[in-house]
Amino acid sequence: MLWSLFVVLQLVHTGRARTVHGSLDSDVAWHGRGQHIVTFLFHGDQAVLRVKINNVAAAAGKESALYLYQDEQWVQIHSSLEEYSCPERLSLAQDTIPLNQTEYNYTLPQMAYPKAWYVIYVDKFTCLVKYEDQKSDAITFEVAMLNPDAAGNPFDHFGADESGLHEFFFLLVLIYFVAACIYIQALWQMMKKGGPMHTVLKVLSTALLLQVVSALANYLHLSRYATDGKGAPLVGSLAELCDIASEVQMLYLLLSLCMGWTLSRKKKSQGKPLQWDRTPASTGIAVLAVSAQVILLVWELFEDANHHSFHAHQSLAENLLIAMKICLAISLACGLYQIITVERSTMKRQFYITFAKGCFLWFLCHPCFVAISFLFKEYQREKVITVGVIVSQSVSMIILYRLFLSHSLYWEVSSLSSVTLPLTVSSGHRSRYYS
């Protein structure tokens, strides 16, 4: 399952690089009234589009050229395609790059704010009424998009929608490393001792480890991307695979815990312990929710090739995923509210309240930051969502860690049995994750 998903991610990521390779195809250009090469968010006054081709003679014979459209012109054309003839569409291009030399560096006009530019291939056959396939030599190309760096030189491969993510993941990895150096030994000793929170901490630690690997993989991918505009697609796919696995594991953990408490409470008296029960109902609900989330996440990947784990591209799969998270938060709120209102123990009640905070932050951070992102410009939205959700999920994990560790310490110091604690884990449950 994981290997199949990794292969899917690898296939989806083929169009993510900002140094693009390919072939210029007259047939594709004729059918589409232009062959789309790439779209990129340029900014500043020294942005450069660098074009290389291998067969100048064939390109010159076809009168090949790259047409550059700003976002406004492109939207205008595609909002009313039937109103424009092929020559009229070409006349709306901001500029044209004739492909009559091996390498061409085009400096874009100064931009007060970031703009999306569309690069389209056109030749003398594009606007013909009828086209017969011409047997000619292939023309391969390489197009590199470069924004000005901090010194104003055109060496930055990141688009305006991606700038800052490299630094963010570096800072995130650094924080994870420092936190690991400080807390890893104490956490390991706590987990070796066992206790009522042992299995919960193992599952939570696995989910956190997946997030750490994802952050490190994203940083390595973006570091390579900064130098060549291509990155490391395998590493980028690994980052997304870890993100999906972490999301799935946390969903199963939080939902099965809450459903187990809710269902077991109907069968047990107040004085008996609450356990992470392996009831068919709680397990079935958790598995159903996890399956639905995996389907939506994979569907979302196919709908957006530039996937960054969380993004502003509002597809049907994305909207369904957001709706699912809101519904899960509401259902957990109802279940925990019923438990809290009838709970007489102050310690247990505080435990459930803190657990609810961690759950709501985990499930609602994505929908909330999607809504908040609409306050920003379009090219900033993906960064707002990505940074906001990752930080919020990290805070949620900290809340849950503090909660479970504090109760483990309370159990150890007071030498109480697990019967007096608000959460215990049955030994039979442990095999579900580590069998």
UniProtKB/Swiss-Prot annotation:
GO biological process: G protein-coupled receptor signaling pathway; response to pheromone
Membrane topology recorded in Swiss-Prot or TrEMBL: Multi-pass membrane protein
Keyword Nucleotidyltransferase carried by entry: no
Keyword terms, alphabetized: Glycoprotein, Membrane, Signal, Transmembrane, Transmembrane helix
GO cellular component, one term: membrane
Leader sequence segment: 1-17
Positions of glycan attachment: N100, N105
Subcellular location: Membrane
Cystine residue pairs: none
Transmembrane segments: 168-188, 200-220, 244-264, 282-302, 320-340, 355-375, 384-404
Organism annotation: Xenopus laevis (African clawed frog)
Superkingdom of the source species: Eukaryota
Stated name of the protein: Integral membrane protein GPR180
Cross-referenced Pfam families: GP180_GOLD, GPR180-TMEM145_TM
